[in-house]
């Protein structure tokens, strides 16, 4: 059996390692996992098929797989104060798919946040499975504040009387009032589901309210702010446990990815530490430091700022460029972010009026407020003066910052 990585793959792998080491990563959904998580992702656990759940497998030889998955389930329950946890979903999208299947029948009505306001594809986007399987209606944000308007959400819910309300977003920078969502859901007898994929790490660290107190089902990814192996996680009340488990297997998936489940479990254990709590606090501090610099230099922030790990910047109104153009300018100097639609966007989704900036990855590398102030000034300088000479100068500043906070130094391929 071949024991060496193909040179066709190895070259790209080493280039990607170098890119991660030498760039400032500001994509809000990305992070740097620990060396332990990396090792588990590539462990012998990838060889094992384990359809079913601990103690109830359809394959033999699952004794040690059961030990790891059971530890992951218990850790997730304790970390988020959940009655039940399923750590098998391959992704956040599949976690959402299973949650819908547990609560709904096809064509049932759902109210969720619109994509342009900050929602996610799996919250009813027409060409996504959610949009053509269920009957979605949407709420957005207030046009003046660009924040959730709970009175307006209540009006929409009372009008459409959904079976399920989805709270949570992929590009919303303010605290979400889960208690208010629960009160609205109760007025029409609807279930409440929270997608906390972006904020799970902040919830674990205690710097964002925990939706488990109010929601019937909570879904999340295990990467992003949770800093784990890529995948999904479902947390719920005990009364929904059987339906959720059946919706995951055999409803949505076959064999679970046990190497990734081990990586998820490791990340959940890491997230249970005091060190991780400090990490979550630092994310919020860093986001506010970055936001302040951008605002002080004339950039307009959607919703007026941020309470969490991300910032949405309106580059169209302040700099007269699209999000796509801003993304390319920043990438040219080694700062990675993504173009993003903003509320009431007049640009097409491939161009957008905004960019989304996140602090989790560089906080993992050790950046604190001072470094993020420097990053903010570099961003402003690059977007206001994208001349070749200026961008070359700024690229050197990016390289210098990355060299001061190295990552994955001992990894060789």
From Swiss-Prot:
A GO-annotated cellular component: cytosol
On this chain, the residues bearing N6-(pyridoxal phosphate)lysine are 224
Per UniProt, the keywords (alphabetical) are:
Amino-acid biosynthesis, Cytoplasm, One-carbon metabolism, Pyridoxal phosphate, Transferase
Primary localization = cytoplasm
Report the catalytic activity.
(6R)-5,10-methylene-5,6,7,8-tetrahydrofolate + glycine + H2O = (6S)-5,6,7,8-tetrahydrofolate + L-serine
Region forming the signal peptide: none
Q: Where in the cell is it found?
A: Cytoplasm
Alphabetically, which GO biological process terms does the record hold? glycine biosynthetic process from serine; tetrahydrofolate interconversion
Q: Does the keyword Endoplasmic reticulum apply?
A: no
**Top-level lineage group:** Bacteria
One short Pfam name that applies is SHMT
Q: PROSITE patterns in the record, alphabetically?
A: SHMT (PS00096)
- The EC number(s) attached to this protein equal 2.1.2.1
The protein's site described by Plays an important role in substrate specificity is found at 223
- List the Gene Ontology MF annotations in alphabetical order: glycine hydroxymethyltransferase activity; pyridoxal phosphate binding
Please tell me where (6S)-5,6,7,8-tetrahydrofolate binds in this chain: 115, 119-121
Q: Which cofactor does it need?
A: pyridoxal 5'-phosphate
Q: Which Gene3D superfamilies match?
A: Aspartate Aminotransferase, domain 1, Type I PLP-dependent aspartate aminotransferase-like (Major domain)
Q: Which InterPro entries match?
A: PyrdxlP-dep_Trfase, PyrdxlP-dep_Trfase_major, PyrdxlP-dep_Trfase_small, Ser_HO-MeTrfase, Ser_HO-MeTrfase-like, Ser_HO-MeTrfase_PLP_BS, SHMT-like_dom
Kindly tell me the pathway this chain contributes to: One-carbon metabolism; tetrahydrofolate interconversion; Amino-acid biosynthesis; glycine biosynthesis; glycine from L-serine: step 1/1
Which family is annotated?
A: Belongs to the SHMT family.
Describe its function: Catalyzes the reversible interconversion of serine and glycine with tetrahydrofolate (THF) serving as the one-carbon carrier. This reaction serves as the major source of one-carbon groups required for the biosynthesis of purines, thymidylate, methionine, and other important biomolecules. Also exhibits THF-independent aldolase activity toward beta-hydroxyamino acids, producing glycine and aldehydes, via a retro-aldol mechanism.
What PANTHER family has UniProt attached to this entry? SERINE HYDROXYMETHYLTRANSFERASE, SERINE HYDROXYMETHYLTRANSFERASE 1
**What interactions and quaternary structure are annotated?**
Homodimer.
What is the name listed in the Swiss-Prot or TrEMBL entry for this protein? Serine hydroxymethyltransferase
